[in-house]
A protein has these predicted regions:
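Active-site acidic/histidine proton-transfer and metal-coordination neighborhood
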Residues: 1-71, 162
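Histidine-acidic metal/acid-base catalytic patches
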Residues: 51-73, 77-164
């Protein structure tokens, strides 16, 4: 096991409560690091809300230790919540070891995600691997998976090293 990702949390109503989560993630990340495992957090749309006047996602990035906690940015939910992943890459460089790559249906299906620009900034983000998910199926699952894999494998902006 190389990576462990926390897939969800309910967003607390106070920063004090959110800090408890961040401290917990730091401790888990420290224990994982001692075993050679990277620990990260995966966002959804609900992290892009204000808690006591501060964006929860930013608060989490600011209150977790980069050495112990990385972020698997869900590009779809970041964009769908009217945020720009590039702003996060620039503000928190190196924190996004995994990209959760998805679109409304198969990858590239909506043409609204801007994957070319996102992947062209992957080095700033700290990307090690993209992880593909399909949000909604319009075809059989295996066909969707193949179409998404074909899209990434053919995309000139996706480094060959990610195509393992």
């Amino acid at each position: 096991v190389s990576y462990i990702v926390m897939p969800w949390m309910n967003i607390p109503s106070t920063l004090k409560q959110l800090k408890v989560y961040c401290d917990y993630y730091n401790e888990v990340g420290k224990k994982c690091a001692a075993q050679g495992i990277k620990f990260g957090y995966h966002n959804h749309k609900h992290e892009f809300v204000n808690v006591e006047g501060q964006m929860a996602y930013d608060y989490m990035l600011q209150n977790t230790v980069p050495k112990y906690v990385f972020f698997q940015i869900d590009l779809y939910w970041c964009v769908r919540s009217n945020n720009n992943p590039l702003d996060y890459f620039r503000k928190y460089p190196g924190r996004f070891k995994l990209f959760h790559v998805k679109d409304e249906n198969e990858l590239g299906g909506s043409c609204s995600m801007g994957f070319d620009v996102i992947f062209n900034n992957a080095a700033t983000a700290g990307l090690e691997y993209p992880v593909v998910e399909i949000e909604r199926y319009s075809h059989p699952v295996m066909q969707e998976a193949k179409e998404s894999a074909d899209y990434l494998n053919a995309a000139p902006f996706v480094k060959k090293t990610y195509r393992k």
